[in-house]
Amino acid sequence: MAQSRVLLLLLLLPPQLHLGPVLAVRAPGFGRSGGHSLSPEENEFAEEEPVLVLSPEEPGPGPAAVSCPRDCACSQEGVVDCGGIDLREFPGDLPEHTNHLSLQNNQLEKIYPEELSRLHRLETLNLQNNRLTSRGLPEKAFEHLTNLNYLYLANNKLTLAPRFLPNALISVDFAANYLTKIYGLTFGQKPNLRSVYLHNNKLADAGLPDNMFNGSSNVEVLILSSNFLRHVPKHLPPALYKLHLKNNKLEKIPPGAFSELSSLRELYLQNNYLTDEGLDNETFWKLSSLEYLDLSSNNLSRVPAGLPRSLVLLHLEKNAIRSVDANVLTPIRSLEYLLLHSNQLREQGIHPLAFQGLKRLHTVHLYNNALERVPSGLPRRVRTLMILHNQITGIGREDFATTYFLEELNLSYNRITSPQVHRDAFRKLRLLRSLDLSGNRLHTLPPGLPRNVHVLKVKRNELAALARGALVGMAQLRELYLTSNRLRSRALGPRAWVDLAHLQLLDIAGNQLTEIPEGLPESLEYLYLQNNKISAVPANAFDSTPNLKGIFLRFNKLAVGSVVDSAFRRLKHLQVLDIEGNLEFGDISKDRGRLGKEKEEEEEEEEEEEETR
């Protein structure tokens, strides 16, 4: 029978501060996870990991049939799922032994206390995504549910929180309502309460009582994001390890606001109005367990002093920070990720000793600032350094002399010119795997490029040729991007690629090539040549590249008859051949005549350039 099979109780644990797909309910005793990993790409940590509640494979002795409301799914173990069946009234024929009830995604507007009062065993009640109002949910609606552990009321139309909730609660979700007021016993006097979700409401300071968590000192997760709070709530539970206050109206944090939160590990304060004056040296002083702090998108002009020494990830992007002083970061010896992008930093604003002693700091984001040169005193063990979108004009000999462990370096979209790159600038970067110099003002590839690099990007520069020996010794190169430059066919001789024995991807799209380059590496798998002036594909075009999987020739000058079919016969691995956007139906003779004239004009331009040189 279907009712005796394993049945998932589809209940939602609050997702990442927005309502998403229906997930399963978390079992009692959930909380902090053991191996907590941090990543700079995370906008925020997940609220909780969902856990499925299953009824047993082989149910124990019980009635052969279970009374079940129409269109609902019920099990003999007390799991009832009435989610998403367009209910407009509370089902009246629920089994009395129901312990998990799912009513999410319906049209319920009101619930009467007597409808719930006989469900004495109820442990989980999911009412999220209905049309419940505070008037339709009486204060004593949950009075008799003495075993209720999990209550989900997210995405309804509540303006006032229930005045009384059962004392056995473990997790409560009121997210995405219109709440303006919380009462003292809404969350108070609940010793088992572990997580409270109140994000995306209309809560202001006056709507939160000072004793909101009186008698509920074990709360570990509190989400108050996207409200109208101007002050940090008072008397927060000392067991908190995750506190979300982002997207509020905080301007300052008063002394002692976090003084009792020695267990706090994650603090989210982004998208507020915090200023330098709103934080003092002791604001975060007592947060001895804090690992993740997000202060992005505020009004800070400097890196705050007195940050916790336990920090692993620090978000300071999208402020107005102009300076990083000598001693504000150096005490944070556990710091691994530092995000300072989208500020107003200049090279002189970063003290040469700002990163001294930060041996664990491996990821630094400094992009979208106003740096005129590479900052001195970079962290010695940095592995990922993002300095794109600044105003850097050159790279000096000693700029990267101490960053031996650097693996990824992004210098794209600066103002770097070829003469201003010292030939020994990259000499110490023996571990570098990715180098991005796109969007600069390079006329030639800089000399002395790291030989062990796997990915080299020099897109959107002013390259007219690859100088002899520019890629010499780069046998480890896998991907080379030369997109949107001024490269011409005569400037790419077959010797240009001779050392690239492991090259798999070559992108020369958006240049001025009239022919397919010769002597390409045998290892090549993907060749991008779109948006050039290539007029023909001869029979021997790909003789040196039998391993090609993708050829992209879109938007060139190819005409009917100019592509020799036999050119592709040896390409046993070819999966994609893109030649759309060419002159497939043009007058071949006219096309060839026009292309010949273009070639003559190109040769004349090249001769003039040589005379100028």
Swiss-Prot record:
Glycosylated sites: N214, N281, N299, N410
Acidic residues: bias regions: 600-613
Molecular function terms, GO-annotated: collagen binding
Keyword set, alphabetical order: Cytoplasm, Extracellular matrix, Glycoprotein, Leucine-rich repeat, Repeat, Secreted, Signal
Tissue note: Kidney, heart, liver, pancreas and vascular smooth muscle cells. Also detected in aortic intima (at protein level).
Signal peptide: 1-19
LRR repeats (start-end): 97-118, 121-141, 147-168, 169-189, 192-212, 218-238, 239-260, 263-283, 289-310, 311-331, 334-357, 360-380, 381-402, 405-426, 431-452, 476-489, 502-522, 523-544, 547-568, 573-595
Transmembrane helix is among the record's keywords: no
Gene Ontology CC entries for this record: collagen-containing extracellular matrix; cytoplasm; extracellular space
Disordered as annotated region, ranges: 588-613
Pfam families reported in the protein's UniProt record: LRR_5 (PF13306), LRR_8 (PF13855)
InterPro entries on file: Leu-rich_rpt, Leu-rich_rpt_typical-subtyp, LRR_5, LRR_dom_sf, LRRNT, SLRP
Stretches assigned to the LRRNT domain: 59-96
Homology family: Belongs to the small leucine-rich proteoglycan (SLRP) family. SLRP class V subfamily.
Protein name (record): Podocan
